[in-house]
Amino acid sequence: SLKSAITDPKALLERLSLPNELLEQAQAASQLFPLRVPLEFLNRMELGNPDDPLLKQVLPIRDEFIQAPGFTEDPLNESDARPTPGVVHKYKDRALLILSGACAINCRYCFRRHFPYSDNQLSGEHWQRALAYLKEHTELREVIFSGGDPLVTSDHRFSKMVADLEAIPHLERLR
């Protein structure tokens, strides 16, 4: 269950019988991007192995503070393609809807770790603005649900969004 996910670096290290020397850097780096590891994923990791490949996907490390030349916090160049909150429109005939910033697991290599999810919540007025934008742009044929993980959206809310999008005649595909 998502609610029982490990979010504390100390708890992760203890559960995996890993040395406390990893704790300071894990706590510091988790301030940059939070730790989130579902128990089902954690249970597949090898106890006592700091080089476990699954652990390396989720363990915050000090290297996350390195500023590498040529790297950017917006690797997909989405900041200039957000015409209204929650909508990313980079390609002529398709747009992304950012349904949620939440994921079941926070991978350290996440390309959207710096995405301003709090400014892109698709609720209330933002949802109405997103719908208006999608209706106005008749070149759009496809809407792609994205996030975080769009499937953490409640069934009721997701169904309502799909129904609203199905009412836009020029949209042919939802994925």
Task: List the predicted regions and their residue ranges.
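Flexible, acidic/Gly-rich N-terminal and inter-domain linker regions that tether
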Residues: 1-90
